[in-house]
Amino acid sequence: MLFGLIRVALGAIIFLFSFLLIQRSRICHKRTWIVSAFIITIALAAASAFIPVEDTFVTFSSAEKAYHYNHSGSVMLEVRGKKTSFLVGKRGNAYEYAIIPKVEHGWKLGLGVDIEQVGQIASDGVFIQVYKHKKSEECFIVVQAVQGGMADISDMQNSEFLYLEEQNRALNNSFYTYYAYIGNLNDEYALTVNGVRITPCQA
């Protein structure tokens, strides 16, 4: 994950430069200055994770490449929207989500601060979450069939629901999670899961 490595490397360079500058100077209380320089370096590195400078001049050729720049998981699924893509990554046994914004000539970094969960509901054997990309206002829905087996899912927008399957040998069952792009969401949005109508943003 280059995102983290670059910040560690730049932080080390900045601190080393500050350390040498302080050691060669004639100021008093050098130890205090060195500790202060270390704290400031850590703060700058942390701030750069929320406001990455490279996002202004680095463009990626695919959403997956943008994902791998600041995520270490393997991409399992990509759900494409008009201005963004929703990527499902897996790191170990855990899944992680990222929304990658699209620009004219490629893709930019997907940052956690740009994602908002705008809906969540557990109903009739399913767990539903709705995520919005703040800048584009595009939304994606995640539907987990918690009781196992495939689900019959449709919505009022005729969205295409893609899915990932997770097999549980201990329970001798397969569990499915469904993903779809649903555009700019409003409170009237509804989907039907196994014949049950659900409005995730009114719950």
Where do the PLM segments sit?
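Transmembrane alpha-helical segments of multi-pass membrane proteins
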Residues: 32-45
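Membrane-embedded alpha-helical segments of integral membrane proteins
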Residues: 1-22
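Membrane-interface helix-boundary motifs at transmembrane edges
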Residues: 23-34
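Structural motif
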Residues: 142-149
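Short amphipathic beta-strand and strand-loop transition segments with alternating hydrophobic
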Residues: 73-78, 127-132, 165-168
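Extracellular ectodomain segments of secreted/surface proteins
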Residues: 115-142
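Ser/Thr-rich low-complexity repeats and stalk/linker segments
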Residues: 152-203
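N-terminal export/targeting and maturation segments
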Residues: 43-119
